[in-house]
């Protein structure tokens, strides 16, 4: 068998690319040319993106990469993992990633977001979600960092809420949006939205 041959497989709609020259494996949806990101639901008071192949971080410090992969997969119809993103960026799995790392990774996968050094306004949250663009959220707690993907919003009784995908728990939460600092609970700590990667305008 020629070990220098590039081998591709298509399994149940997933195109698994095994490049034996580099020893890397990547995955993408075979019919992504026809893929269009969709909303889970839309109404006058709620808009939620229907996430596609959302990713967890596993046992590693890959929340940043899993959040990037979740956004990229929804936008592009792919099936990248957190490890795929970290490998492409050349970052070790337990090193963690900065806002700049996440923004660059998104851009490399064709999701042209900017690094924004604060929590974005409610107007900008709505604008991004309305355009089917989940938001990369970097939060802090006692000097530590954690990343999630914001993929929806709603208004109920004049209160504003955001939907987030947490790669640490591989689950969705709905939390109150607060102009002074949106918070969420994870791993027995309270985390505050600190930085953002999104379309800025």
Describe these PLM feature segments:
Residues 4, 8, 18, 84-201:
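Conserved active-site-adjacent core of cysteine acyl-enzyme catalytic domains
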């Amino acid at each position: 068998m020629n070990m220098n041959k590039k081998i591709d497989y298509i399994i149940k709609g997933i195109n698994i690319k095994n490049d034996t020259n580099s020893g890397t494996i990547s995955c993408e949806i075979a019919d992504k040319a026809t893929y269009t990101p969709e909303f889970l639901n839309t109404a006058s008071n709620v808009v939620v993106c229907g996430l596609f192949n959302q990713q967890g971080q596993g046992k590693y410090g890959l929340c940043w990469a899993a959040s990037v992969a979740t956004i990229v997969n929804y936008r592009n119809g792919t099936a990248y993992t957190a490890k795929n993103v970290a490998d492409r960026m050349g970052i070790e799995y337990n090193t963690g990633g900065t806002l700049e790392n996440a923004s660059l990774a998104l851009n490399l996968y064709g999701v042209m977001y900017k690094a924004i050094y604060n929590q974005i306004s409610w107007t900008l949250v709505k604008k991004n979600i309305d355009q089917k663009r989940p938001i990369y959220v970097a939060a802090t707690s006692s000097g530590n960092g954690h990343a999630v993907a914001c993929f929806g919003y709603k208004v109920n009784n004049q209160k504003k809420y955001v939907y987030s995908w947490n790669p640490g728990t591989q689950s969705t939460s709905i939390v109150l949006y607060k102009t002074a600092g949106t918070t969420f609970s994870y791993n027995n700590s309270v985390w505050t939205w600190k930085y953002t990667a999104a379309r800025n305008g």
